[in-house]
Amino acid sequence: MGNLKSVGQEPGPPCGLGLGLGLGLCGKQGPATPAPEPSRAPAPATPHAPEHSPAPNSPTLTRPPEGPKFPRVKNWEVGSITYDTLCAQSQQDGPCTPRRCLGSLVLPRKLQSRPSPGPPPAEQLLSQARDFINQYYSSIKRSGSQAHEERLQEVEAEVATTGTYHLGESELVFGAKQAWRNAPRCVGRIQWGKLQVFDARDCSSAQEMFTYICNHIKYATNRGNLRSAITVFPQRTPGRGDFRIWNSQLVRYAGYRQQDGSVRGDPANVEITELCIQHGWTPGNGRFDVLPLLLQAPDEPPELFALPPELVLEVPLEHPTLEWFAALGLRWYALPAVSNMLLEIGGLEFPAAPFSGWYMSTEIGTRNLCDPHRYNILEDVAVCMDLDTRTTSSLWKDKAAVEINLAVLHSYQLAKVTIVDHHAATASFMKHLENEQKARGGCPADWAWIVPPISGSLTPVFHQEMVNYVLSPAFRYQPDPWKGSAAKGTGIARKKTFKEVANAVKISASLMATVMPKRVKASILYASETVRAQSYAQQLGRLFRKAFDPRVLCMDEYDVVSLEHETLVLVVTSTFGNGDPPENGESFAAALMEMSGPYNGSPRPEQHRSYKIRFNSVSCSDPLVSSWRRKRKESSNTDSAGALGTLRFCVFGLGSRAYPHFCAFARAVDTRLEELGGERLLQLGQGDELCGQEEAFRGWAQAAFQASCETFCVGEDAKAAARDIFSPKRSWKRQRYRLSAQVEGLQLLPGLVHVHRRKMFQATVLSVENLQSSKSTRATILVRLDTEGQEGLQYQPGDHIGICPPNRTGLVEALLSRVEDPTPPTESVGVEQLEKGSPGGPPPSWVRDPRLPPYTLRQALTFFLDITSPPSPRLLRVLSTLAEEPSEQQELETLSQDPRRYEEWKWFRCPTLLEVLEQFPSVALPTPLLLTQLALLQPRYYSVSSAPSTYPGEIHPTVAVLAYRTQDGLGPLHYGVCSTWLGQLKPGDPVPCFIRAAPSFRLPPDPSLPCILVGPGTGIAPFRGFWQERLHDIESKGLQPAPMTLVFGCRCSQLDHLYRDEVQDAQQRGVFGRVLTAFSREPDSPKTYVQDILRTELAAEVHRVLCLERGHMFVCGDVTMATSVLQTVQRILATEGNMELDEAGDVIGVLRDQQRYHEDIFGLTLRTQEVTSRIRTQSFSLQERHLRGAVPWTFDPPGPDTPGP
């Protein structure tokens, strides 16, 4: 917060008042050249941005259109003229009258807020409340919404019932920031968006006030890297006294009146010094003694609290060239924190709301040290400089003042304490004026306070006319609490030290029970197609509960407008398919891309539409991100803060390096939050499912927790808490879980809805057909499903079907035989967990685990729990505690704690849970462990292979039936859970399923555009729907679409040439112009893959279709094939288009952004083992570097163009 102290400046007239060009509260004008009379200007809803001219002799004049009259404001340096329309929103008259100007008064009576004897009139309060609520909902772009109307009704009802109302937390944050933004006397308002708001409205005593203030000082000081902050104590309530801070600033130096009438210390603080002494303070006798605080709770006498020395950062003053300057013994404190002003928001008054920023150097060097009624060192310094002080024409005052200011700047910079010089501050204010003119049509400003006390006309603000008016929310002056009607109880109270307060907090059980609401709030957001990200987010929540007040939310449950009022956000997300957001993160991603950042004003179309260009690009350039990072590095506390100026964030991405866009969505969120002004606390964390994902998350989570604790000055035992959360000793304990019999379980479909949190539907099998030859050792099946016309199963060609399969019966029965305490076969059970109690809070209690609905154990293992995937290190750690054989216990512990050992074991064996139990037979397996610790059985996704126009009421997935042996082909036979089950189904069998739309993988609306389709193996699946749709267009609609080109690939023409007859029929009927097939294992023929066909036979066509005819290319298949095709297309475009390879990559990025290069990528297949092994080796290397500390978690994250996903 730049120079917030100027809002509550030291008493006394500001300097440089006589020759202003400002339009004051009464419209006063400078004497040199009278400003023109106000002209007609646009209405407030359509403010005009200022137009600057290159030189004063060629001024720019905005034409005043018809409308209400508004002040015309001129910049006399450049000649530009603007109209301040924002002033029309002012509801309060200034102190000036038509006959007199009071703009130079420091404390005009009209601008002071005095406590009224009774509550404010209800209608007056309601009017102010409505205005503020309207402002708030307009700021979040929800004006006129149902939530807006309901909030207005809620406020009206509360005022009618109680005579007042209360702000929501987001409303308070918005109001506090707006009050700073509206402060006419503050020159550093460009950073208004970075104000950190601490909500202390639950405070009930002076002791708690002191605790909050200590936290404020510690946070804001930040070891010298000052941060703007405000702490808001309870609002003024009718019939009750106020919370007040008697000191004008949280840190002030004492002023001792001497017998000869002089003052030792700061003369501005003589009165508060004497009050502190009256209330029990034992004074020193120095020039720079830090005053204690006098804090007052409602209807109580003030209490004295001494600030601990370690809390107050002070800077000894020295000069860069004048060595004698240090001997003067001067010093000043780092943190300017105004504490005697009132915050008004929507008619509500907060008499205690200390706020802090950082100093502008002239406030210390000119005002505090040189003013005659302050430390008055000017002549002493001049004498030391051998200046002639006998005559003013020697300019000794100016010379000495400059050197003192130089000493202040030098000393603060040497001590690494934030400070800003008056030239930088005023330049930033001019930028702020420009921003505000564009955003709001004006900016209230008091010229007499904005112009610094030295270098007046050398700064740009001197030449800028300003309009001064009062907006709400606002900071207002108020009478000192010991004077007049504000005085209440000045009895002497015993002083309390910081140590006493700290001890009281530690030992008070009742206080500890209410600590959580006072903690810094943190939002933990997750998005994933599975529950992995949710599980990690919940672990993160448990960790952050040690020192914060966290809430864990799915992205689709989170209102993105809340980001502007957040303090700390942690994101855990996966990436879906081709670098896209998971389905439950799509709305969050869209809203995030739409938000505007500090350097771009409003979102430009190329920024919020270019997600794929910026974060999924195959080239090595991202000009937008590079430009942003340059500006970010060059930015300072005189730059605009951005929409998310107060946000601190950390992001962790989940994914697989086998995919070309590894963690692309996580990188997008990480980059976008920074662009919008947020502060990254920790580099982007990335967890590779191919190796060490859980270990990577643990390391990142601990580092994120520690960084957050350091940032917010909480959790001194952060490292210990983080280690404790992930310690093996915190493993699953059977005594904390118990089973409870349930009357009746749910049907299957409602249970799946409960577990997967999405609508489910039941389709019925019509037929299952093997598409491969009977001579083939493999199987690929076409499953025809009857949707029975259910609306939720409607789809378009290119969409996916999600299917929820059961586990194999034999596997379930074998596992049940290993359970030590099986429940009766027909008894539905639930699991209850013992929740710990808290001192002064509720006692321990048994709480039902909501993860699974009540089912029999057999049903749970069959339909809901994953028993085929290799157990995670976390689960192995639990199993180690249940092993009776010491050697097995040791081996399980090793696997759970050694990432490389675990990954090698998992990769070689790929064991099911049953195989793990066979390897470690002494492990006991209690039922609660299975129901609470096993991962959930996830849906399997398949491309839809049909068109509803051709097969109404049907869905056709094409599925490769998976079967393989582990341990280099010598291990047990494993079966694909879903594919094997689908292959065994009979007509009439039910299939629980749902549709996942794939809007980026659909035929273009214009059928005249050429398309190239590339899909080997089951990659042909979505294209079957495409050709059926085109056949329908030709034969039912009479259209003549451009013939498509199909590139298919398989092993052998006689074994696995899928849909050959259908494709030939479609070609004969005009759907395809060309059909080319690549055979990788055709007898007596060389191996050929689809990318070979593209390179040797279709290069010219690929370039023509994509670059000249605005056509489309669709690629469907596994990640390795898709990557090879992408690289081939890039080389083709470079060769055929005569461009560099990077340029061709940029072209593909544009094609993706225009949705003309489409990819539908599915996971690893057996033939990608070599590639996957290489990727795992790379991931191991990176992971081990992290664990050794060679790659710390705190360096700048790689850009979105980093090679590898």
Curated annotation (Swiss-Prot):
Binding-site residues, (6R)-L-erythro-5,6,7,8-tetrahydrobiopterin: 104, 448-449, 462
CDD domains per record: NOS_oxygenase_euk
Protein residues bound to heme b: 186, 477
Primary localization class, coarse: membrane
Lipid-bearing positions (N-myristoyl glycine): 2
Keyword Manganese: no
Cofactor(s) of this protein: heme b; FAD; FMN; (6R)-L-erythro-5,6,7,8-tetrahydrobiopterin
Keywords recorded for this protein, A-Z: Calcium, Calmodulin-binding, Cell membrane, Cytoplasm, Cytoskeleton, FAD, Flavoprotein, FMN, Golgi apparatus, Heme, Iron, Lipoprotein, Membrane, Metal-binding, Myristate, NADP, Oxidoreductase, Palmitate, Phosphoprotein, Zinc
Gly residues: bias regions: 15-27
Residues where FMN binds: 528-530, 532, 574-575, 656, 663, 689, 693
Residues annotated as binding Zn(2+): 96, 101
A GO molecular-function annotation: metal ion binding
Entries under InterPro entries matching the protein: CysJ-like_FAD-binding, FAD-bd_FR_type, Flavdoxin-like, Flavodoxin/NO_synth, Flavoprot_Pyr_Nucl_cyt_Rdtase, Flavoprotein-like_sf, FNR_nucleotide-bd, NADPH_Cyt_P450_Rdtase_alpha
Binding site for NADP(+): 778, 1018, 1051, 1080-1081, 1087, 1089, 1091
Post-translational modification: Phosphorylation by AMPK at Ser-1179 in the presence of Ca(2+)-calmodulin (CaM) activates activity. In absence of Ca(2+)-calmodulin, AMPK also phosphorylates Thr-497, resulting in inhibition of activity. Phosphorylation of Ser-116 by CDK5 reduces activity.
Upper classification of the organism: Eukaryota, Metazoa, Chordata, Craniata, Vertebrata
Gene3D superfamilies in alphabetical order: 3.40.50.360, NADPH-cytochrome p450 Reductase, Chain A, domain 3 (1.20.990.10), Nitric Oxide Synthase, Chain A, domain 1 (3.90.340.10), Nitric Oxide Synthase, Chain A, domain 3 (3.90.1230.10), Nitric Oxide Synthase,Heme Domain,Chain A domain 2 (3.90.440.10), Nucleotide-binding domain of ferredoxin-NADP reductase (FNR) module (3.40.50.80), Translation factors (2.40.30.10)
Region (Interaction with NOSIP): 100-488
Keyword Lipoprotein: yes
Alphabetical list of SUPFAM superfamilies matching this protein: Ferredoxin reductase-like, C-terminal NADP-linked domain, Flavoproteins, Nitric oxide (NO) synthase oxygenase domain, Riboflavin synthase domain-like
Cited Pfam families: FAD_binding_1, Flavodoxin_1, NAD_binding_1, NO_synthase
Family membership noted in the UniProt record: Belongs to the NOS family.
Residues with the Phosphothreonine modification: 497, 1177
Region (Calmodulin-binding): 492-512
Biased composition annotated in UniProt, kind: Pro residues: 33-47
Protein name: Nitric oxide synthase 3
Binding-site residues for L-arginine, renumbered to this chain: 249, 358-359, 363, 368
Gene: NOS3
